[in-house]
Amino acid sequence: MRKALFLSILFFLFLNPFFSQEIVHTEDLIAVELEELEKEKGFTEDEDLEELVTEEPPASLEDKEEKIPHHSLPGIPDEILQRPDVEKFRQQYLSEKWSKLLYQYLEDAMEYRLYVRKAIQEKEMPAILEYLPVVESNYKTNAKSRSGAIGMWQFMANSVWPFLTLNDFVDERLDPWKSTEGALKKLNDNYNYFQDWLLAIAAYNCGVGAMTKCLKKAQEKNYWYLVDHNLLPSQTAHYVPKLLAIADLAMNSKYYGIELPDHEQEFKELINERDGNFDYLEVNKAYSITQLAQEMRIDEDSLKHLNPSFILGMTHPTKKSQIRLPLGMKEPAQEAIKKLTPIEFPFKYTVVAGDSLWSISRRYGVTVQAICDLNNIKENAILKIGKVLYIPKK
């Protein structure tokens, strides 16, 4: 019989006042941008896209001056980059508003973006994948979509296994390093299945099962055939064109006359987060990240920044956890952990019909506020049947 785990709530809250991280809620980025683009340009149908290109010819690959060469995207024919659906997104990001936003996304994401670039090169995967997190989340590590996808790579809860860990204490979707490894593994699995990178990327959006069904209806095993014959979900049909447009602009910013950061110099001198080179401390009990930082005499926020997957601000109470540390800090962490007392965690209660925070608090002899503080919920929260609550020790 498993031994029950208990927590002294006052002690825990005093030492760990922040045990959940803020989530940036994002809408469906492609849908929102298409809506804005339609309002600004006044088009809604595919024929309007062609009219846009006809009325205001873009700086096409042929029309540009020879002195600024256009660099082809590896594995992507130039004629693909001139498709109207790719051009639509390219024109969007060439506008003053969106070019500034794209610059900001890429600049703010430098630490993680360079790690993604390094990982892609090491795995010999397509260079355009560096820009997939822009499509997914604008490189926001704590992004959350309306559909429930979370993190820089927007994993759904039902699609994390076997790539990432997700439980009551750990959500690796919020970890930019682990989620990058998980996303690239998933993309590589998709490629091994479809033997086509554009299909693999599109399947990352709609799922392998959905893509397989679409291909069964197609006469050609080709992403653009699926797009041109309206065999894909709308979002997936726009997914790859947006990625190609962003990658083209980022890799040819001078050609298109816009300023975008490439961070080539920083990539030559990878350090810390950019390199993904850390020390780790393995534990198998619940330890407060705040307490550990204080005992090590290092900045608490910095240690939490390296360990965003610990959603309650502490390691798992019964399973092995790896605490990510700045390089060279493993020995100080080992000494510090010896001085800490593992947190006694409370037992779990599953909400049933008729429950309220007040009735649960009365049943277990604790205050409503104590339950709310421990579970990071408000006193007026509506409890859903099946929700798991942690009940603090009296």
Segments the model singles out, each with a brief description of its role:
Residues Q265-E300, T341-T367, K378, L383-L389:
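Primarily a LysM-type cell-wall glycan-binding module
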Residues S302-K339, T367-K394:
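Extracellular LysM carbohydrate-binding repeats and other cell-envelope/extracellular binding modules
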Residues R90-Q104, Y139-R146, W153-Q195, L215-N230, ...:
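Substrate-binding clefts and substrate-entry loops adjacent to catalytic sites
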Residues N16-S20:
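Sec/Tat signal peptide C-region and signal peptidase I cleavage site
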Residues Q21-E124:
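An acidic, Gly/Ser/Thr/Pro-rich helix-cap/linker signature
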Residues K88, Q104, D108-E111, Y115, ...:
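Extracytoplasmic/secreted proteins, especially bacterial periplasmic and envelope-associated proteins
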Residues M125-N142, A200-N205, L303-N307, L374-N375, ...:
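Short, functionally critical alpha-helical segments immediately adjacent to catalytic or ligand/cofactor-binding
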Residues A4-F14:
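Sec-dependent N-terminal signal peptides
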